[in-house]
Amino acid sequence: CAKIQIIYNFKQFILFFRLLCKKLTTNVMEKAKVYFTDFRTKANGDGLPTKLKNLIKKAGLADLDLEGKFVAIKMHFGELGNISYLRPNYARAVVDVVKELGGRPFLTDCNTLYPGSRKNALEHLYCAWENGFTPLTVGCPILIGDGLKGTDEVEVPVAGGEYVEKAKIGRAVMDADVFISLSHFKGHEEAGFGGALKNIGMGCGSTRGKAEMHESEKPAVHADQCVGCGVCAENCAHWA
């Protein structure tokens, strides 16, 4: 896999973001190429998916050697009842380009810590299917990166890691030859916003990895206020 800097802790994320902003404001950067397209769709099929294919080729995907390689396309399949995730059509556009280049793509994400529709591989897959992500719609298999219960992981040493010495990453992510992050911008209650960094740094973590990253927010029981209602136990996905 190509070397990617991963942020494993929200404190590190904020520090990294501040340093990045400082660098952007103090250094003279090379002008970026800006591409424009409209939202018009023509009868010949020249719509947004086709325009997206052209964009990712221009961005450099077409220059990669993908022949015969396993290509992990990391994305978020959305929770049930949520419609703010990327559409399957966009994932299909990336998959098609990877196939054109001889790659062997698969969509992937790792299980979540919190109770919901993505806390184990079975529910995660059903959630993805109901939200429109199926092998027929996206054109490739869907693999949950850290396995059935989030225990299929690889420990990756973090050089000089202050908070995490060994990151726990989903095995399917680490086994891939090429890694592509397909992410969307969203708000976050602690970091302010989430995008590509969170999609990789948090999203590729196994269940243990995510637990480690959230250690600063461990729940606690105030025994003097507990009434024994059991609501906390009902809402814990891991029976802690």
State where each predicted segment sits.
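Compositionally biased non-globular segments, especially hydrophobic aliphatic-rich helices
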Residues: 2-5, 28-29
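Hydrophobic alpha-helical signal peptides and transmembrane signal-/tail-anchor segments
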Residues: 6-20
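N-terminal compositionally biased, intrinsically disordered segments and leader/signal-like regions
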Residues: 15, 26-27
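N-terminal and secondary-structure boundary signal
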Residues: 27-240
